[in-house]
Amino acid sequence: MNKSTKAERSKQLMSTLPGDDVRQVMWRFSDRYDLQMVVQSTREVARGLIANLVANGARNTHDWTPEKNSILTAFDEAGLTQVFMDPADGGFIEGPKNLALALVAYELAWVDGGAATSSLASNLGLSPIHEKGTPEQRSKYMRMAVPPQPGEDRQIKRGAFALTEPLPFVGVDTGVVSGKLRIDSWDDGQDPVFHVEKRGRFI
């Protein structure tokens, strides 16, 4: 099969993929305006900022750059950071969030798998607090991870997790993983806030 035949076949296959109207029925969110808006917001970020970063070679390094940091800001501005949160903590979706989070990852993965993964990283870091924390802990830490509201003078806190497992079972070579951990701040009567840097070869 030559290149033009492959390209034509790919084009035909792409035209057979279901559109938004069909997916909304298939995945049962045709009556969920909140989920439809999440899809639209995610698509705008994916096909705008993230597509430009990929086109400009941002994926060619594992170093954290200001350009990559702009993805998190775009997530905040589009409301994607709040998808995981309960309305009482600054979110906007009632009930289970799995479908909403899957839709976010799906739209981002069409453009860049790394962006899809990064959209879920903060949620993974917050999940233990969300699932096992006291109501006071959930309220405190989940609200810190939501972008500041108008009139609030604070920085958003990001949840994080570290994955270090031996090859060949996952995609991190632990032989070349290194990191630094320090206490960023620890106010009297408060829990410590850690600053973590991790470097490694990711496969």
Walk through the language-model features, giving the residues of each:
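Glycine-rich, Trp-frequent "lid" loop and neighboring beta-strands that shape
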Residues: 137-203
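Amphipathic, small/basic residue-rich leader segments at the start of a protein or domain
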Residues: 1-120, 140, 144-153
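Short, conserved phosphate-binding/catalytic loop or strand-edge motifs used
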Residues: 120-127
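N-terminal leader/propeptide and maturation segments of large enzyme subunits in energy/redox metabolism
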Residues: 131-135
